Regions:
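Conserved phosphate-binding/catalytic region of the ribokinase-like
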Residues: 1-19, 216-327
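Conserved N-terminal subdomain of the carbohydrate kinase-like
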Residues: 64-148, 319-327
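Glycine-rich phosphate/adenosyl-contacting loop at the front of the ribokinase-like
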Residues: 1-90, 113, 262, 327
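Conserved beta-alpha-beta core of the PfkB/ribokinase-like small-molecule kinase fold
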Residues: 145-226, 234, 242-244
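A short, aliphatic-rich alpha-helical micro-motif
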Residues: 13, 137-141, 197-199
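Short beta-strand scaffold segments in enzyme catalytic cores
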Residues: 56, 104-108, 243-246
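Hydrophobic anchor at the start of a short beta-strand
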Residues: 64-65, 91, 173-175, 235
Length: 327
């Protein structure tokens, strides 16, 4: 059937474990840490964009994953599709947009906690050109987990497409809203769009700043309660050096401390956390186990330079979990 029709399976006839939707781009990082961009002269080129990284993270853990996004019709776009294939992520819904170049993101790396980002997404990023009528809503409906982001709500037609995808999630399954607040990418107040998405999602994930944007609450427990009141079943609040708080509507609470690690680049840690969170939810683990596992995955990536290529395999995560006291 057509793009919005009934193709609900992956290549071997099974529904996807996870479909992510939203940003993809090229990350260019200085190969020397602690150096400002004006002094850096060697850079590494990596696949980037939070939904793309989350997809890679889950694929590394053995999950059947696809990404919905757009690139420019340029060599960087070809590079990204090649990288997705190499990482085991199905890129059938990563199409080219002729009129917009593939986005580039530069980063400065000042461990342990300063990693300024510089987005080059003008005049408009291709991933914001995803249109509702282009979506394979059948596949989105059948995926065991669907992951979308706040940036996808920032501009049309991506906004309408993201909401259409959320509304298609009528079958049992997990729908994750990554709050993903990037103020430089918004021209409007996000409140009404975040409110609509929270009413349609089952899980919300964000750091304390993102939770405050979504709910008006910055205290972690208050933010979690506000997210639950907005409609989700599970609220996950990332608290940086204080660890992670997860609260389920059924009253289950998991408060997990951080995994000690020597930070090299913290930018991919949240995406590794997200992919591992999806993996744990798919596995049916209890909430504390899911969060401990996701925390370990995030810590591993924080100790490495890159994002996508730094995503850990399951044996690496299990080793870190074991050192931290086990699941």
């Amino acid at each position: 059937m057509g793009p919005a029709g009934g193709l609900t399976v992956s290549g071997d006839g099974l529904a996807f474990d996870l479909i992510t939707m939203g940003r993809i781009g090229v990350d260019l990082y200085p190969l020397t840490t602690g150096v400002p961009l004006e002094e850096a002269d060697t850079f590494g080129k990596f696949l980037g964009g939070s939904p793309a990284n989350v997809a890679v993270a889950a694929a590394r853990l053995g999950r059947r994953v696809a990404l919905i996004s757009r690139t420019g019709a340029d060599p960087f776009g070809a590079y990204l599709r090649s990288e997705l294939r190499g990482f085991g992520v199905d890129g059938r819904w990563v199409a080219e947009v002729a009129d917009h170049p593939t986005p580039i993101t530069f980063c400065e790396i000042f461990p342990p906690d300063r990693f300024p980002l510089y987005f080059y997404r003008l005049p408009k990023a291709p991933d914001l050109e995803i249109a509702a009528e282009e979506l394979d809503l059948g596949a989105i409906r059948e995926a065991r987990v669907f992951w979308m982001t706040g940036t996808g709500l920032s501009e049309e037609p991506s906004r309408a497409a993201t909401l259409a995808a959320l509304e298609a999630r009528t079958s049992p399954g997990t729908t994750v809203f990554d709050l993903d607040w990037r103020p430089m990418l918004w021209r409007e107040k996000p409140g009404p769009y975040y409110e609509r998405a929270l009413a349609l999602a089952t899980v919300a994930v964000g750091n304390t700043e993102e939770c405050a944007i979504a709910t008006g609450e910055s205290e972690p427990y208050a933010a979690a309660r506000a997210l639950l009141a907005a409609g989700v079943e599970l609220a996950v609040v990332k608290r940086g050096p204080e660890g992670v708080l997860a609260v389920h509507r059924d009253g289950t609470v998991a408060e997990v401390p951080p995994v000690p690690v020597q930070v090299v680049n913290g930018l991919g840690a949240g995406d590794a956390f997200g992919g591992a969170l999806c993996h744990g939810l798919l596995a049916g683990w209890d909430l504390a186990t899911v969060v401990r596992y996701a925390n370990a995955a995030g810590a591993i990536v924080a100790s490495r330079l890159a994002c996508a290529s730094a995503m850990p395999f399951s044996d690496e995560v299990e080793e870190v979990v074991g050192r931290a006291g086990g699941l």
